[in-house]
Amino acid sequence: MRNRFVSFLGVASYFAAGNFHSISHGRLHAAKQIAHTRAVNTNSTNFARVAFFPNGTLSGLGLSSTCEDALYATVDCDDEISSVMTDGYIGSLDNETLTDLICASTCEASIAELYDSVSTSCGDSAELIAGISYLSLIGQVWSSWNQSCFVDLTTGQNCNDVIAKFDNVTSQADIATTDLCSYCYVKKLEMMQADAYSSAYNDDFESEYKYVANTCNLTVTDFNATTSVFNASLPATTSTCLSGNTYITTDGDTCDSIALAQGVSAATLFYTNPNILNCSDIITGTSLCLPLTCTDLYSVQSNDTCASVAVSNFISFSDVINWNSQLTWNCSNLVSPDPHWGSVLCASAPGGNYTGQALTTTSSSDATDIVDPPTGVTVAIGSTLDCGAWFVNEASLGYNCSSICLSNSIAMHLFVDANPSLNYTTCDSDLVTGDAYCVDPLTNWEYYSSNTTSISTVTAAISPTWPVQTGIDSNCDAYYEVQSSSTTASSTPAATTAISSSTPLTSNSTSTTVTPPAATQSGIPANCIEYYVAQSGDTCATVETKHSITAAQFLSWNPAVSSDCTTGFWADEAYCVSVS
């Protein structure tokens, strides 16, 4: 799990470049105390308790034993509590079941108890890094819970869900007064202004709050952003445009109009340019870094989902997410107005399809040979070994994913595909210090493993191992057995035995292959012989139990799935459950 909660708590939010668009748009407001107002929520559920800091992860950091023990305490919350952690705007989760799990009253009470315990045992001087105290991190969890779970006092509905149903308008003046002055909307702005743990309350929201106060005759004494409890200095960064192409905006430009004219994703354009404050009205003369171009664009419709976009364009769900950086891992903001990034997506790989180097198994030492990983370093989990060059992530270099790609002339999407322990949207924080990453995968690296042994050339005719009809040509070099419809694909009903005399590889082989019954993610081994299409309600654990495999096997065969199964696992996608 690699200390999941440690990575998601505040530090990652502020120092992992690009994880949330609002981080780069906003600023870390400086410190003003806020009283925690408990949201009205009567849901009560029993959960396996969650540790924000797994036992032992804080040893050796100079904390008192009392403080360290307090931080290891667990809370009575669902593990999905991590999904509400953000330095940006907190909106609807678009999932009633998930909202109920996160917003159980037992969770809030447990967080409050932990906050009091850490306050007593650690105070506000014990810091994870200079300027970020442990107490402030627990406070951030509490604040995020409050803003995720507050409800309408009359109806009991989650206020974020209520706000999400407001009419989609382009001007404040077009918002219905009943919505504008509703308890939920006014309370939302009040909580954002008072939040000392987030930079979401920016100049735009301040103007919005003033407009609401004036329209609704509210008495508000302070519209200024609350000073942050975080006093850490952001590290100096250099701005680099990955594509090398910039664009100066003209009057009337929008994210969509630029995306269509330049052949890029509006989502990625918004994500990578923090100087875009409003995608519908970009300030004239703004200098923008253009994303890598893509040959196929798609305009999102109001009833679209990432699954429907994928089906319409013959690509996978994960492709939609990976090629359009502003989209969240579960695609919850595809048509969201918070913030509205536009509607134009890349439906093909940004930068084009990579052809790679020629794969060779000769003994020559030219640049097309497979290069062994550097001696004495650990290869990142799942990284291809069919690789012509490696990058070791040394702490002294201070590289992020963009700088690694630039210095090694590799497209970001290819870098992530060749190293599946990295996620396109969280790449910087996924990098492990000291690990080696492939930065030059060879041609056909997805299909051939450098650990396999070459076998002798097969020259004899292919003989099928099952009954066939009469009259089939004796020169047939491939057979396919008709299969019945099933959500599980295995080598028995979908066996193809084939050999090609024209393939330019150094060895020919007789093989049994399986066609996945649905979209798959990168990293699945070529020798997978059985797939399972995840159904609604499935988890990694249920799939493992159903197919009598271990968690280690499932994660090894499906490296795009995170170790805790919270990312990379979606319904209607195929996962490998057996290999030859």
Swiss-Prot record:
One of its GO terms (cellular component) is extracellular region. Glycans are attached at residues 43, 55, 95, 146, 168, 217, 224, 231, 278, 303, 330, 353, 400, 423, 451, 508. Keywords: Chitin-binding, Glycoprotein, Repeat, Secreted, Signal, Virulence. Residues 1-30 form the signal peptide. The keyword Signal applies. Its main location: secreted. CDD domains: LysM. Residues 245-290, 296-342, 391-439, 530-577 form the LysM domain. The keyword Signal applies. Disruption phenotype: Leads to enhanced fungal virulence, with faster decaying on infected fruits. Residues 498-518 are annotated as: Disordered. GO terms for molecular function: chitin binding. PROSITE patterns: LYSM. It is found in: Secreted. In plants, chitin acts as a microbe-associated molecular pattern (MAMP) that is recognized by lysin motif (LysM)-containing plant cell surface-localized pattern recognition receptors (PRRs) that activate a plethora of downstream immune responses. PANTHER family: AM15, LYSM DOMAIN-CONTAINING PROTEIN. Belongs to the secreted LysM effector family. The LysM (lysin motif) domains are small globular domains involved in binding chitin in eukaryotes. LysM7 contains 4 LysM domains. Secreted LysM effector that might have a role in sequestration of chitin oligosaccharides (breakdown products of fungal cell walls that are released during invasion and act as triggers of host immunity) to dampen host defense. This is Secreted LysM effector LysM7. It comes from Penicillium expansum.
